[in-house]
Structures are given as structure tokens and as C-alpha cells.
């Protein structure tokens, strides 16, 4: 239960204009989860909130309880992540992270670890110039969003029989939920190929903190294959492809 007037950190992950000057914001918070709130008059040039409630911003909000939506009364930017709104490649990645977070989380279900992961991911995307390194960060975010949402892919034991995987495991099953041993993969026709380098990359991403991963520059083909298997897992769970994927692919070329 939230107080009538409360303060929270928040990430702005979606927004829509309503009326002449208001906006409905979808925010993700560490202790209240995902909320829809209203920012009254924010589109007016004279609004004190203008510029403090942009997409992808990490902010600290003061909110008042309302009938339909809680109301933003104050906002103080914690991290602006300006590059995520100024560079087309980063814009597409910011939209992707925001939509993935939005679709993978129910309303008002707190997950502080997922909030921290998203802040760290946006911070890395904001400063990294190397395209491959930013792609690795997206793979890290996809994998750990799955993990923190209760869908940890099997990368160390077979997704079917749960025996320890050997380096010759080369099939990934989004339906079963991870890598299959050779014996089990022969009985599952709907699998994706996963080579040894991709297998090692996903294991590394699962084990290491993001601050270590930011310096990693694998072969682009390895990152691409990791993208395909993680995309398949996400599509299996969400039962659709994220809308921002098309924008991301278009910008990537």
C-alpha cells in the first residue's frame, strides 16, 4: 500500500499524450514495480516538469495518490541518459530495452534487481560507442531479464533431462527452455543451432557482472547467433515479437 504522497526512483519507459497538455507515463520503480501515472500540464512550455520526464530518464519522483492514476508533483533527474535520445542507434536500443521491460513485467510487481539491471544497461548503452559491445549489452539484458523474471535458460544442464551439458551440445530449444544434450536434441525437431562460441558466450554472460561484460568484444557472428536464440526464448514466453525489434533491425541495417 502506497502513502497518499510518496517518493520513488523511476525509469520512464512509455508515455502518451492526453488532453491538451497532459501525459500518461508508464514508469518502472524498484519497490512498486510498473505503474501508470499522469503528468499534468507537462506539455506546456511553462511546465516545471518539462524536460524531467523524457523517455528512458532515470528520475526521482514525488507522486500523489489519485483516483485513476497517481499524479507526478515533482521530478528530479538522477541519470539523464541523453545519448539514448540523440543518436538513432541508441534510440532504437533504448526503445527495445523499455519495451522488453514493459512486456516482461506485470503491473505493481516489484523487482529491485530488475530495476538495477535496467539502469545499468541504459547507462552502458548511453556511453559505449562500439556497436558490437552495445549488442553484447543487449544480449546481457535479454538473458538476465529472463533470469530475473523466472525463466532462466538451461545453459549448464540439459533443458530436458537435466544432465550436465558437454561442449558438443549444439541445439537450443526455446520451447523446452535452453540447450539440449545431443541425445535429447535428436528427439526434439524444433530447435535452433548453437555453436560452441555462442554457448560459451551465453554462459559467460550468465555468470559475470555487467561491469565486466562491457569490455567484451566477441565476433559479430557469435553475438548474432546469441540474439537469435534469446529472441526465440522471449517470443516463446511473450507469444509475439516485440514491436521495437523491427526498428532495431532497420537501424542496424
Swiss-Prot record:
GO BP field: DNA recombination; double-strand break repair
Claim: Translocase is one of the keywords in the record: no
A GO CC annotation given for this chain: bacterial nucleoid
Keywords assigned: DNA damage, DNA recombination, DNA repair
Record has Protein biosynthesis as a keyword: no
Matches recorded under InterPro entries: ARFGAP/RecO, DNA_rep/recomb_RecO_N, NA-bd_OB-fold, RecO, RecO_C
Primary role: Involved in DNA repair and RecF pathway recombination.
Entry similarity comment: Belongs to the RecO family.
Designated name of the protein: DNA repair protein RecO
Gene: recO
Amino acid at each position: 500500500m502506497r502513502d497518499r504522497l510518496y517518493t520513488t526512483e523511476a525509469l520512464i519507459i512509455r508515455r502518451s499524450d492526453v488532453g491538451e497538455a497532459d501525459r500518461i507515463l508508464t514508469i518502472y520503480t524498484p519497490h512498486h514495480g510498473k505503474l501508470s501515472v499522469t503528468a499534468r500540464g507537462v506539455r506546456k512550455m511553462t511546465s516545471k516538469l518539462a524536460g524531467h520526464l523524457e523517455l528512458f530518464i532515470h528520475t526521482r519522483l514525488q507522486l500523489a495518490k489519485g483516483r485513476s492514476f497517481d499524479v507526478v508533483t515533482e521530478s528530479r533527474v538522477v541519470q539523464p541518459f541523453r545519448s539514448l535520445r540523440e543518436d538513432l542507434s541508441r534510440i532504437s536500443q533504448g526503445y527495445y530495452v523499455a519495451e522488453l521491460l514493459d512486456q516482461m513485467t506485470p503491473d505493481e510487481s516489484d523487482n529491485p534487481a530488475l530495476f538495477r539491471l535496467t539502469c545499468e544497461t541504459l547507462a552502458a548503452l548511453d556511453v559505449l560507442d562500439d556497436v558490437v559491445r552495445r549488442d553484447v549489452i543487449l544480449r546481457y539484458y535479454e538473458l538476465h531479464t529472463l533470469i530475473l523474471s523466472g525463466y532462466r535458460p538451461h545453459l549448464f544442464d540439459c533443458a530436458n533431462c537435466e544432465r550436465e551439458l558437454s561442449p558438443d551440445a549444439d541445439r537450443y530449444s526455446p520451447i523446452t527452455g535452453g540447450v539440449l544434450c545431443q541425445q535429447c536434441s535428436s528427439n526434439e525437431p524444433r530447435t535452433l543451432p548453437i555453436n560452441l562460441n555462442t554457448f560459451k558466450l551465453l554462459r559467460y554472460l550468465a555468470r559475470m557482472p555487467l561491469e565486466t561484460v562491457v569490455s567484451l568484444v566477441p565476433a559479430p557472428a557469435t553475438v548474432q547467433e546469441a540474439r537469435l536464440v534469446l529472441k526465440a526464448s522471449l517470443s516463446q514466453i511473450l507469444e509475439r515479437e516485440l514491436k521495437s525489434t523491427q526498428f532495431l533491425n532497420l537501424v542496424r541495417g
